[in-house]
Amino acid sequence: MHKHSLLSAFTWLPASRQRALRRNLIFIVTTLAVGLLSKAFAAGGTYVVDDGAINAPGECNVDAGYTRSPQRSTLSAACTSSALPNLQWGAAIEDDPEQTQLSPQLKGSLWAWQDAGVEIAWAAAAHIAVDRRHPFDGADLGVPLTWQAFETLRLNLNVGWSHAYDDGEQNQRLTWGTGLEYRLADSLTLLAERYGQQHGDQAWQAGPRLHLGKQVDVDLVVGRNLTGDRDRWLTTGATLRF
């Protein structure tokens, strides 16, 4: 009897790529299962370029992502309270072979022009290395802007500033990013972005986002550095909201 499976459609991939895809699928299924069992529904954080919106008052999201080559996993959560409807607060934890980093985050609404489809916010984050003697690793400030150009198309623009410790050296750089979201159907959105730092790294990412109802999204993202060794990567993520 011939055995069929989801991965049988990807037999043309090299064995190493098949193993990576299998791990990514297991990660997605596990994340969704944990989220559903805990009645938590999270929002997608696999992309770098932010939008100009914040959660509605009383709404929270939890994001999870796994990147292969270089290996990295992330988990984040954010909420907007009814008492402070213009402020979203949260935290992210990122784990890779070199370190584990905790990042408290704040994001606030600056201005919205609903008739023109424009939203502007401010965002701030601090980065703390939890397994290092000197834990403070840097901070980011940014201004994300979103323009709903059409019902199916959103454009995002980010400008900001980053302060980081690179191998003990302090660096301050301007940061930027551009992104677009094109909704093909109720269940599918295509995303692409390019982002970078002044005199630093630059990269792009793109991929589909599957909408499993109104509360669950799944991302499959490919990316590549545009500087240095031009690494490539594959990221899978799950977005759940409540």
Where are these regions (language model features)?
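Cleavable N-terminal export/targeting peptides
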Residues: 1-47
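Transmembrane beta-barrel domains of Gram-negative outer membranes and organellar outer membranes
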Residues: 41-242
